[in-house]
């Protein structure tokens, strides 16, 4: 469905993506993981046409995306930080996008609007919303037009536990409908029950792209965080690399620390 061929991208002297090739198909949930600055967001924005690669090609349903933005209507995108007009009310935002897309009401997916109880804040300006509430708005917008492909950048960041579970349930529901879903997250426990494939980037390079079951079999670990830590042993990373890279959870699920690599 989406095919990437030898994508390269530099920002001045910084290599963001170095010769990335991969294919993503319907029914897959691809988890893009790696340290900060590894190229995850650049890859996502390249697929969306928001960043133009220096070289290489990207195909959507076997058609090159260059010069034809129409394919984007078939993708639901949830950015890590949603940016919306400050003075626009929440309800106006949804109405505006429905009018732009001209999609009949019976063809929209408003489940997250209902489950997040967003109609209760339709009269509030976007500037008054907390970070977590803005995340709920972004999530509801990503799913609103029942897209074939979902691209979710740190989707549970800033969400309370209940809202996080609601969103994960929705992702699983769309997975069961054979949609292609790409997710980035530093909270690996969020990905255990969702993902089918792991795509690991480091310094703009693709280190591995594996089915999660293959990864578990190779490492003997059921938990994604532990599996990745094992498979990376013997590489150039330090022994504390996995701790530095990801949010760790204690035995009862509480967040212990968050150290990021830049």
Language-model features: locations:
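Conserved ABC ATPase "signature" region
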Residues: 95, 106-121
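Conserved ABC ATPase signature
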Residues: 125-132
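The feature captures the beta-strand-to-loop junction immediately N-terminal to the Walker
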Residues: 33-35
